[in-house]
């Protein structure tokens, strides 16, 4: 079955404590602070600052600890799949997204640069979900088709993906760019390919209204039967954000 399944939200109130969540330790001491009251996410694009701009992050753990990673967001001409936004995440990946009714965003395709892979999601993968109440979740089930980015006519494989997104609550987050009241979105991905390769990816992403993503902790586990296994944890915190003002369009008379 493909699509998105809802889970009921809890009433608005103080967000649950994040104490005991080991993954958040990769962000460093003093980053994640006290829980605060959490409203419904009526406009996730506003919380995530879905506008052209550039965000610079400091990597706080893993092999690249101390390095800077740049993320950018840009408008593009509509593609054949209706994508009108491009989000570039360092040298790791480029996401192509489109807006949907109600204020959310979906991810029809992405490029994973280290593997030179072009990935199509069917149906498009939920990316930002409008209307989530605190504690509410959505589960997405779908298919992913993976092609060579250098030769899109060559299909490498097909897999299944399940994504569970939870709006956990709102928390005080302190980064080199400042202190923020930030909404926490937890996303868990389960990817299975040929019943041979299994990928489990967990992300805790903090968004501050008017700024966008201010911190993120990720735990990725890859198991390939009889081939290899990997287990990596990466944290990043915001250092700076620069909006990019697009030139005003002048219509011909």
Where are these regions (language model features)?
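Acidic, serine/threonine-rich low-complexity disordered tracts
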Residues: 5-96, 148-253
């Amino acid at each position: 079955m493909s699509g998105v399944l809802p889970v009921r939200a809890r009433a608005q109130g103080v967000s649950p404590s994040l104490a005991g969540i080991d993954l958040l330790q990769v962000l460093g001491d003093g980053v994640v602070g006290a829980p605060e009251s959490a409203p419904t996410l009526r406009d996730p694009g506003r919380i995530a600052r879905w506008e052209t701009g550039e965000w610079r992050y400091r990597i706080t753990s893993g092999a690249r600890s101390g390095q800077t990673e740049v993320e950018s967001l840009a408008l593009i001409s509509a593609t054949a799949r209706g994508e009108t936004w491009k989000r570039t995440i360092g040298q790791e990946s480029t996401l192509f997204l489109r807006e949907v009714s109600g204020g959310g965003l979906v991810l029809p395709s992405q490029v994973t640069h280290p593997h030179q892979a072009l990935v199509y999601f069917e149906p498009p993968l939920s990316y930002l979900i409008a209307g989530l109440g605190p504690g509410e979740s959505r589960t997405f089930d779908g298919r992913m088709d993976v092609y060579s980015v250098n030769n899109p006519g060559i299909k490498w494989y097909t897999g299944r993906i399940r994504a569970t997104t939870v709006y956990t609550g709102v928390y005080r987050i302190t980064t080199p760019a400042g202190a923020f009241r930030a909404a926490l979105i937890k996303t868990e991905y389960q990817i299975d390919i040929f019943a041979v390769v299994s990928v489990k990816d967990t992300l805790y992403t903090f968004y501050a209204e008017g700024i966008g993503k201010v911190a993120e902790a990720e735990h990725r586990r890859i198991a390939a039967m009889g081939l290899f296994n990997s287990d990596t944890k990466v944290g990043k915190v915001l250092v700076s954000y620069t909006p990019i003002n697009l030139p005003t369009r002048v219509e011909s008379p």
